[in-house]
C-alpha cells in the first residue's frame, strides 16, 4: 500500500520576469551621450534639456555631461536634464 497520498495538482508555480526599471544614473554623476538615465513605465520622470525619450518612455542623455534632477511647472513634474561638463 502507498504510504503517501497522491500529489494532486496546483495552480501556482509561475512568475513573470523582472523588468529592471528605475533610475540608472543619479544626480551629479557624469555620463556619456546615449546612456540610459531612467527606465520607466509611463512618464514619472519627464525629459529636460539634453535628454531624449524612447518609445517605451526610457530617458537617455543626448550629450556628455552631468545628470541633474529637478521639478518644473505648477504641477511640480519631475524633470531630468543633462548639463554639459565644463
Curated annotation (Swiss-Prot):
One example of a Gene Ontology biological process annotation: translation
Segments of skewed composition (Gly residues): 1-10
PROSITE patterns the record matches: RIBOSOMAL_L27
One Gene Ontology MF term: structural constituent of ribosome
Region span, Disordered: 1-21
GO CC annotation terms, alphabetical: cytosolic large ribosomal subunit
Keyword check for Signal: no
Matching SUPFAM superfamilies: Ribosomal L27 protein-like
The entry's keywords: Ribonucleoprotein, Ribosomal protein
NCBIfam families for the chain: L27 (TIGR00062)
Similarity section: Belongs to the bacterial ribosomal protein bL27 family.
Protein name: Large ribosomal subunit protein bL27
